[in-house]
A protein has these predicted regions:
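Bacterial carbohydrate/catabolite-sensing allosteric modules
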Residues: 1-149
Length: 149
């Protein structure tokens, strides 16, 4: 499954970078299909109550983690920091509520249309895998560099 591989690459890259900077990494791996993810998240966070930084594999999972942390009386970014992945926001003109690694949706759309047109015209597909740059989109769930001690 290509999506699983890309998701694993996402996780691996993030963990490798943290470890190269001297940070320890604890991982909660949940198998799909997800069954009661909030309960798994709650159990993990209870077992590791000193966690102060979280990378969620996507923005939806980050929101689930934030809901669990709210149950514990913790708020981001005061008590912990969290970064999602995908660049979720309600509308293009809104700011990000969640700090996230955002994907260039316009470039994704362009590459998708190009591939689709190749398939429709029965051309040999030139694009099978496209790597596009991502960027950090600051939301309200991480501290600014000046706030980090």
């Amino acid at each position: 499954n290509i999506h699983e591989n890309e998701t694993k690459q996402r996780e691996l890259g993030f963990c490798e970078k943290l470890m190269s900077m001297g940070h320890s990494v604890l991982k909660l791996d949940m198998s799909e299909p997800l069954v009661e993810p909030e309960k798994q998240i709650e159990k993990f966070l209870l077992e590791h109550s000193t966690i102060d930084g979280i990378f969620a594999i996507n923005d939806f999972m980050a929101i689930k983690v934030m809901k669990v942390m709210e149950k514990f009386g913790k708020k981001a970014p005061q008590d912990y920091q969290i970064i999602g992945f995908d660049g979720l926001r309600n509308a293009a003109d809104q700011t990000y509520l969640l700090s996230t690694i955002a994907q260039p949706l316009d470039k994704i759309a362009q590459a998708s249309v190009k591939l689709l047109l190749q398939l429709i015209s029965k051309e040999k597909a030139v694009l099978s895998r496209v790597l596009l740059p991502v960027y950090f989109a600051e939301g309200g769930t991480t501290k600014k560099n000046t706030e980090i001690t």
